[in-house]
A protein has these predicted regions:
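Bacterial N-terminal signal peptides that target proteins for export
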Residues: 2-12
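Bacterial N-terminal signal peptides
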Residues: 10-21
Length: 152
């Protein structure tokens, strides 16, 4: 009887292990939209009309159109793009890409980056390394602090 109970426990733990590992392989983004198109042969998902994508770190990307290339974990957001992280930082632009593998967000055109603690960065074509939390741009940018001081 004890051997049978041991076997049941071993099977139970093996199942838990596989279920846990299966969840780790889940999709990188949870995407919702009014209209969703899937190109299975290219492994691409296209969302149109009030699209919202949420990644595993809780970062939320909202746009008029989102194209997600699943194989390379690359997301393209276009039209009224708003990216919010868990700390409350908000990035707004008209077009952005998110390279999930390298954890890099790149914006195209005018960009506003509002930090949760009141700081504001306005610029163009900004690259944001989300792991190191470093913003870069080769264009003229303006940084404003909470007291209204401006650095260009």
């Amino acid at each position: 009887m004890r051997i049978k109970n041991k076997n049941i426990f071993i099977i139970f733990y093996i199942l838990i292990f596989f279920i846990y590992n299966f969840n780790l392989q889940a999709e990188e983004f949870n995407i919702s939209a009014k209209e969703v198109l899937i190109e299975k042969d290219k492994d691409i998902l296209i969302g149109k009309g009030l699209v919202k994508a949420k990644d595993s770190q809780g970062r939320v990307i909202e746009a008029n159109k989102i194209t997600y290339k699943k194989k390379i974990e690359y997301l393209i957001a276009e039209g009224d793009v708003k990216i919010t992280d868990q700390e409350g930082n908000v990035l707004t632009t008209n077009k952005a890409t998110y390279d999930k593998i390298n954890e890099n967000i790149t914006t195209y055109g005018d960009t506003q980056f509002k930090l949760a603690d009141g700081y504001n960065l306005a610029g163009k074509n900004i690259s944001y390394d989300t792991l190191k939390q470093i913003l870069r741009s080769n264009e003229k940018s303006t940084f404003t602090d909470v007291d209204g001081n401006i650095v260009e």
